[in-house]
Amino acid sequence: MSISVFNRCWSKVILETLVRQGVAHFCIAPGSRSTPLTLEAIRLQDSHRVTCHTHFDERGLGFFALGLAKVSKKPVAVIVTSGTAAANLYPAIIEARQTGVNLIVLTADRPPELIECGANQAIVQPHMYADYPVASVNLPRPSQDYSADWLISRLEQACYQQARQPGVVHVNVPFAEPLYEASETDIEAHSWLVPIQRWLNQHKPWIQQQTDQKEVLMHANWDHWRTMRGVIVVGRLPVEQTMGIMAWANTMGWIALTDVQSSVEASLPYADIWLANQTVKQKLLQADIVIQFGSGFISKRVNQFLAAFKQEYWIVEQSTGLIDPNHHAHTRFNAKVHHWLRAHPPLRQKPWLLEPLALSKFCASFIEKQVGGNLNEASLAHHLDRILSNNGVLFLGNSLFVRLVDALAKLPEGYPVYTNRGASGIDGLLATAAGIGIGANQPLVAMIGDVSALYDINSLALFKKVTQPTIIFVINNNGGAIFDMLPVEADVKEKYYRMPHHLEFSQLVQTFDLKYARPYTWADLGAVLKVAYSRRETTLIEIKVGASDASTIYKRLIEQISYAVIGE
């Protein structure tokens, strides 16, 4: 038996299984040991069944796959070779686990006899991602001692676990040499594939799993609770689950606090600012019940309110993981939000508290005055809706800017907003944005901090592959301006936290052959955007701002609103 031929047969069954579980994208890094998997992915692409994406940097590739999976809402597979290539996927795997995004990571490996004996590029890869995968499959070296149906069943079981608890599946695949020179004729004719030939021809899963989605039942005491004073908080959710939330809350007369990641147009915007007012916060704490939809709230003051609330607490979230860092005694509904809303009809009532509405309206004009008419970080966040296309998507990085947007912006209803707020790292943000833009095939605006952009600068190469107008804003405040919020001595903060880099991005962008602009005014920006939206390519727009301008405005807003007196 030719080892190279059977390596391909083994890989064929692996990839055919994944395609039947919904995988339509394979993200591939260069490497020799992963050759059998890579060649099978190419075969699937040649038959127009999948799309292959490539990148030379495994860390960026993992985050690119994460972006694809976020926007497609289907599992995306990643193929890498052995050694530290596999280790470089770890940050993306952590983020996928924390946010319930489905990745299937295929790590090629050396065979067992080459592990822990000094062989080149050989590390211990089984369970290398610890508990972050929802399922780990450590395959043996390809061998006819294992039937093809065993291999299919083993992989399908892992995918079924992923369907029940979204996250990462890790499949470690050792291959012995030789890895090359296997003819397609020999692969197709191999006797090991004969028992599954019907399955190969039908393009259906081996095991027909029946979904166990249960009908959402009305809470036994809903007729009581819907007459009470309530607050809903809406966090990170798929757009399709958010339809009807605000109409439901408004009918109930309940207060609604919405995170920018929810894609819900806030009826009480700027909550991160007006919740700094202790008088209004204390009145809000008089609510009888809080219902949390989704998770991952950005606002510090929303999180402080939730931590202080001690009455009835419900959580509605499709996933099964814990999503309450305040550890309330609560009622949990494992359900899609729109299904839960249908099962819990609202009762029409007048608003039970008017001060939040009055303070929110006051904030709208107050913020406008404070951010001013200049093009700066705060005004860009406040007027973010001005720069978005009608049919596009938005990605927000993990800098000070995402907090400013959550606090100061009011985005259109249902506008798709994506973030990496699971572990909230600054790694892989450009790569994630590229995956979202290419996966959505819509105009993309990505807002990234300067340090985040420098950290992931390799991923600018991915933006050469876009086919829609793509705009990357780099907010360059010369270092980690978010650390200006810390109570640390100024000289220590500057040297050990902010770490000014004194770099600009014009030359870096030229290296990657992307368009570049640096507007100084809103009029400049308008002209730049008009051109950028007319091109099916990437434009990087650098906004240079003072190191502490935005944090100063932000802190001033919080301080002044905290003393505001608003009557009913």
From Swiss-Prot:
One of its GO terms (molecular function) is magnesium ion binding. It is an enzyme of class 2 (transferase). Pathway: Quinol/quinone metabolism; 1,4-dihydroxy-2-naphthoate biosynthesis; 1,4-dihydroxy-2-naphthoate from chorismate: step 2/7; Quinol/quinone metabolism; menaquinone biosynthesis. Keywords: Magnesium, Manganese, Menaquinone biosynthesis, Metal-binding, Thiamine pyrophosphate, Transferase. InterPro entries: MenaQ_synth_MenD (IPR004433), MenD_middle (IPR032264), THDP-binding (IPR029061), Thiamin_PyroP_enz_TPP-bd_dom (IPR012001), TPP_enzyme_TPP-bd (IPR011766). One of its GO terms (biological process) is menaquinone biosynthetic process. Binds 1 thiamine pyrophosphate per subunit. Its EC number is 2.2.1.9. Its cofactor is Mg(2+); Mn(2+); thiamine diphosphate. Catalyzes the thiamine diphosphate-dependent decarboxylation of 2-oxoglutarate and the subsequent addition of the resulting succinic semialdehyde-thiamine pyrophosphate anion to isochorismate to yield 2-succinyl-5-enolpyruvyl-6-hydroxy-3-cyclohexene-1-carboxylate (SEPHCHC). Homodimer. Belongs to the TPP enzyme family. MenD subfamily. This is 2-succinyl-5-enolpyruvyl-6-hydroxy-3-cyclohexene-1-carboxylate synthase. The gene is menD.
